[in-house]
Amino acid sequence: LANDGLSAKYSWEDIYNTAAGTNPYRYPNQKFYTSDYLRKNKSRYDVTAEFEGGGKFAQFYTNVSYYREGDFLNFGEGKNNYTDRLNVRGNIDLQLADWASGWVNANATYYNQHGSNSEFWKAASTLRPNRVAPFIPLSYLDPMDANSLALINNSRNIITNPAGLPAGKYFLGATQEDQTNAFADMYAAGYNTWTSRQMQFDTGVKFDLSSLLKGLSFKTMFAVDYSTSYTTSLNDSYATFGVNWTQFDGKQIIGSVTQYGEDKHTGTLNSSNSAERQTLAWTGQFDYVNSFGNHNVNATLLANGYQQTISGEYHKVSNANLGLLVSYNYAHKYYADLAANVVHSAKLPEGNRNAISPSATLGWRLSEENFLKDVNWLNDLRLTAGYTVLNQDLDISEYFMYKNIFTATGTWWGWSDANNSIQTSDSQRGGNDKLGFIKRKEFNVGLNGALFSNRLSFAVNYYNTVTDGLLAQPDYIYPSYMHTYWPVSTFVPYINYGKNRRTGVDFSLGYKDKV
């Protein structure tokens, strides 16, 4: 600072006494990374128990595990820091009949993380050692200073034998710049516990319907995924004291103290940061697999849906699908896949909430043709081409974007700004009952192969993806009176207008061998 023409921040007396350690409470040199505050290691233990058994019709397995982990901090509330987790997981496999089987899976997790309301590690990396003395002995108080004694004696945070200091009683020190600190927090600010509870459950049955039609089967499943978390905390505030040092009879004593803050202790645990999430899912599907000579057929008829409830959000996230896939190949040489999916979205207006997404793929295994079959170094060579139109609402960010919106708190206007101003009722968006799904149209052609006893593999794919119908409010395609700048108002709706294209080539090359 002297080089800049400013007065020195620290006097030579401050520097000397800090280095000499003559009075660590007046000239602090606070340490963080010592054995007074930190353990050399932290403990962790794990316990796991497994149970299994069953008979002809049912088999079960259960796993119970628990772990608890301590912390490096070893003083104040920090020595009580811990993390623990209890997990119970089990499943039951059922053989109901020769043609029917089922299962039940369940998992529950209980997780807790307890810690002090002190940001010790942050302070250790940022707080300068000479900024503040966190604890000051009561013995330095002037016994004739009634005002200072009264302030200190009224404090509820007189710390007995704090870590790293000689035995005795201490009050919480401070300065005007640092009225609280991480060490005082550790003894007087309280603690918090973050709690998480999770539960997953699924059950299903599977039926072999070959007695009705060869290769036919059916399975259905229901699942629940639930989680909740919250924080409980004891949030105390506390008084700290800045001191004015003086010299009396050759000894350094405290001439006066200044109180910062107040002692507040309710004794009541606070609950905050509560969050909850629940997902319910169901699926049911028929599968058909059969071969007729060189003709191989595979088909799936699938219906599924899920609904997700999230705390703090009004709308549930819902998804429902009905899909059909038919796959055919001739002698594993020529392939054709046809698929269709019926999708539903509550984000769209009535009449436009359902759509069909078709997909088709063709494949040709060139390596099985006569003109390549005898090429010894060629193990596999396939040519594929596919086209898909996917109707999706992932890019529709909110519900009711097809609705018109008015506000009663629009632009201020009037004859007098002081007495007669009122707000207009303005349109903020027009409605559009024709709003539809965003379509993702994808065409791809690929060549895949394996060479030299399958040691070398490669894949080359060309793709051309067009996303059509992205939502926008293009006011420039509407008459100018549909949008005004004063008052600020618009009747322009969201429409399916945006379009983008992504095209390119992917190439991958792999090699594997035994050494």
Residue ranges with predicted function:
Residues L1-F75, L269:
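Residues embedded in well-ordered regular secondary structure
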Residues L6-K31, D46, R128-N181:
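Acidic, glycine-rich flexible loop segments
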